Amino acid sequence: MPTPALLVLADGSVFRGFSFGAPGTAIGEVVFNTGMTGYQEVLTDPSYYGQIVTFTYPELGNTGTTPEDDESDRPQVRGAVARNICDIPSNWRSQQSLPDYLKAHRIPAIYGIDTRALTRKIRTVGAMNGGISTEILDPVELLQKVLAAPSMQGQNLAKVVTTRTPYEWTEPTPAAWEFRPQTATEEPPLTVVAIDFGVKRNILRRLASYGCRVIVVPADTPAETILSYDPDGIFLSNGPGDPAAVQEGIETTRKLLGAQRPMFGICLGHQLLGLSLGAETFKLKFGHRGLNQPAGLTQEVEITSQNHGFAITAESLAQTPVEITHFNLNDKTVAGLKHQTLPIFSVQYHPEASPGPHDADYLFGEFVAQMRAYRQQHPRRQ
């Protein structure tokens, strides 16, 4: 017999289903992801820390799980919600079923509910806190715990998911999955310092595949320490939570701007770059989470992978030295920035995909080109 489970939202909505994860109770912000594939990458993406993810695609777990697809060392979500669950996966790469994977990592999850109704609720009312439980099956009691939980707004979660010590990343994209092979070069590798606000492994793989030596540092690393590596470029990673609350990241980025070195930001890193330049951010009603978000400016459109609940206020960029390079074409929110005089740019989406389309992978190539140009103008001291 399946174990009964309960999902309660902060507005009092109640959904009854069955457990496909670990027993217990999980409280977090309930959001939805519209991707048809890549559930393991979603579950292990640090940007989802503190959230309960609803998968809108009705079938989940069909291909099982494999350590190769993890975007971090463990699942980062508080919980998961699905319509139907596959207990017996069918894929040659699978090493563990999704239910067993979640149980091993102590992540509660619920299936058998009307995920379409839940998604429409979030889309209409907005993302809100909720709770999944196999031990509290009284909606009133679970609602009390949900209402006592803090809002995502104002939370600095980057400090929770960041690495504790610096390390060097050397693993490129596996040859079997490489879709844009790089030509071998005799030039020395470029040094990139990646500030880890919750970085995905595939971002680091893409940088390594483009010939970069990648040094990953904690989110609170001072600008002086970062510059002591004499980097050819600085990368601002993705991550969870409210960007305006990541004050150490904003201050560090502001100081690094003075070094005038190439800088590339993705997702939270994009928002921190905007904040460091004097822009403002706001919380989206229900966020952008999926693999088919159109982004562009004029005649060219990229289909992108996105995962964020905050965005830069377009009007606040008027007095900053940047120009908008991309909009999200669904709601016209800012999706890309470029500094007017410095080799600095950022995007609100994920060019590394994993999961998702590869339309924007060229941005890593642009970052590399900027770094090589910088190093030609500023030769490394022998």
UniProtKB/Swiss-Prot annotation:
The active site is at 267 (nucleophile), 350, 352. Pathway: Amino-acid biosynthesis; L-arginine biosynthesis; carbamoyl phosphate from bicarbonate: step 1/1; Pyrimidine metabolism; UMP biosynthesis via de novo pathway; (S)-dihydroorotate from bicarbonate: step 1/3. InterPro entries: Anth_synth/Amidotransfase, CarbamoylP_synth_ssu, CarbamoylP_synth_ssu_N, CarbP_synth_ssu_N_sf, Class_I_gatase-like, CPSase_GATase1, GATASE. It catalyses: hydrogencarbonate + L-glutamine + 2 ATP + H2O = carbamoyl phosphate + L-glutamate + 2 ADP + phosphate + 2 H(+). Its EC number is 6.3.5.5. Pfam families: CPSase_sm_chain, GATase. Residues 1-187 are annotated as: CPSase. Keywords: Amino-acid biosynthesis, Arginine biosynthesis, ATP-binding, Glutamine amidotransferase, Ligase, Nucleotide-binding, Pyrimidine biosynthesis. GO terms for molecular function: ATP binding; carbamoyl-phosphate synthase (glutamine-hydrolyzing) activity; glutaminase activity. PROSITE patterns: GATASE_TYPE_1 (PS51273). Small subunit of the glutamine-dependent carbamoyl phosphate synthetase (CPSase). CPSase catalyzes the formation of carbamoyl phosphate from the ammonia moiety of glutamine, carbonate, and phosphate donated by ATP, constituting the first step of 2 biosynthetic pathways, one leading to arginine and/or urea and the other to pyrimidine nucleotides. The small subunit (glutamine amidotransferase) binds and cleaves glutamine to supply the large subunit with the substrate ammonia. This is Carbamoyl phosphate synthase small chain.
